[in-house]
Amino acid sequence: MYLKKHESKLLLIPKNEDKEDAGIIAVLTDRVPSVLIVRWFDLFCFGFAMCSYVLDFFSDIGIAIFHFWAGRHLSGALVLTFALIPSVIINIISMVWMLDDEMHWKRRAHPRRTGTFELNQKRFISLGKMITLCIFQMGPLFWYYKALYYGWMFTKNKKDDTDKEKRKFFMKMVEAERDATLLRFFEAFLESAPQLIIQGSIAANYFQNYYISGKYPYWLYFQAASLTLSIISISWSVVVQNRSLRMTRDDKVNIWPHEAVLQFCWRFLTILARIITLVAFVLLFGIYVVFLIFGHLIVTLVHVIFLQALHIEACTHIEKLLLLINAMIHLFTPFNMAEGNTRYRYLVAYTVEFIEMMIIFLLLPTPLDAFPLIEKIRIGVPATFFIGIFIMLIYYKFFHPNRRQDLEAPNVERNEKLVVSELNGIPSAAIEKAEHIEEIEEHSVPTTSESLLEEDECHN
């Protein structure tokens, strides 16, 4: 269990770069499920993610403008810096992926691809529109819109799941969603999470100053709304990242809507408690909180290495980078980046969070005594944390998708035995004829893995 290396489930890492052909990379977790399902909830997830991204980004920009307008230039500069720099990084990555797709679109005239589904379609979006989206910091919306479009085309198609065109729609939707959720995931922890500490500290200071008068400036309400949107954004990004990975795995069961809601509630409550704890550390220690964060990263890195060590063939540098990224994500919320049991990983991570929360609210009470409503905060924050943990336990005990998978496994086994018993009663000549027909179909129709390798837009 300890120091055992696991496969990464955050990134789709190539097995062999020599297999790349016209932009197609065979990746470890790219598998097409045997049963293709796109629910209305999946389409809702795409739309909700687009709305939350836009609201989160522009609310941060609006808060920065409010601060500049009121003459609080330092506060405005901090909010604007932590909003724009991560957004620029994410949109540069998005632009690189778009250009990569554009390059592979131009290479589709390969003789092997003549007459395929791909050549009958125009490019999804023009290069000019791609650049415009990224300039206005809306690059990630392209991938969500693409996933939403192909998901809608899949649901509109009334043909059987074995239909080649319908499977293409599904694979394109999954590919676009994978890119979108990965961008959104990193955007959440590059931009939204640091913004929560910055804006939370600013809001706490001004709340303390205006509490005696009882009259709060209007921008403080907007800042509270912006903080709420950021927490929603982070919580939802973790949920959809998990859901996206499960959708493409034939060995995994996809997340149902009520399971996603439980995951979201658990994440929202624990992240809310964690952010309030970090803001309290900032109010208490100021700039010296950097040393506490550094200490937390060291502790986190140790237990991540012990419990979530990754194995990526011929990619030792990527292993180290992913471990470091995972440790930084743990500053805000535990995240399971590796395959395997999550019990001990979350137990250790949430124990560290609980100890830090108790230190700031119970062992060091004197400096925070002057803060308004501090007694309610000391009770409310741990209560919020434990409610989130309780929802997590309910989720894993009764509603985790693997429980449905375990229940379905015996039925699958019984069906296989039934098929075998039925075949025993079929004449051998009929079986040979069926096998001959199946052999002809295998030579005329591409297999699932071959159709995946024909997919032209997998680039990361």
Swiss-Prot record:
Kindly indicate whether the keyword Cell membrane belongs to this entry: yes
PTM comment = Cleavage by ced-3 activates ced-8 function in promoting phosphatidylserine exposure at the surface of apoptotic cells.
Q: Which UniProt keywords apply?
A: Apoptosis, Cell membrane, Membrane, Transmembrane, Transmembrane helix
**The keyword Ribonucleoprotein is assigned to this record:** no
A GO biological-process term = phosphatidylserine exposure on apoptotic cell surface
Q: Where in the cell is it found?
A: Cell membrane
Site annotation (Cleavage): which residues?
Answer: 21-22
Cystine crosslinks: none
Q: How does it sit in the membrane?
A: Multi-pass membrane protein
**Residues in coiled coil:** none
MF annotations from Gene Ontology: phospholipid scramblase activity
Tell me the residue ranges located in the Extracellular compartment per UniProt: 67-77, 145-219, 296-320, 375-378
Q: Which residues lie on this side of the membrane: Cytoplasmic?
A: 1-45, 99-123, 241-274, 342-353, 400-460
Q: Cross-referenced InterPro entries, in alphabetical order?
A: XK-rel (IPR018629), XK-related_scramblase (IPR050895)
Q: Which GO terms describe its cellular component?
A: plasma membrane
Membrane spanning stretches = 46-66, 78-98, 124-144, 220-240, 275-295, 321-341, 354-374, 379-399
Describe the task this protein carries out: Acts downstream of ced-9 and caspase ced-3 to promote phosphatidylserine exposure on apoptotic cell surface, possibly by mediating phospholipid scrambling. Phosphatidylserine is a specific marker only present at the surface of apoptotic cells and acts as a specific signal for engulfment. Regulates apoptosis kinetics during embryonic development. Not required for engulfment of germ cell corpses.
Q: Which family does it belong to?
A: Belongs to the XK family.
Protein name per its UniProtKB record: Cell death abnormality protein 8
What organism does the UniProt record list as the source? Caenorhabditis briggsae
Give the encoding gene's name: ced-8
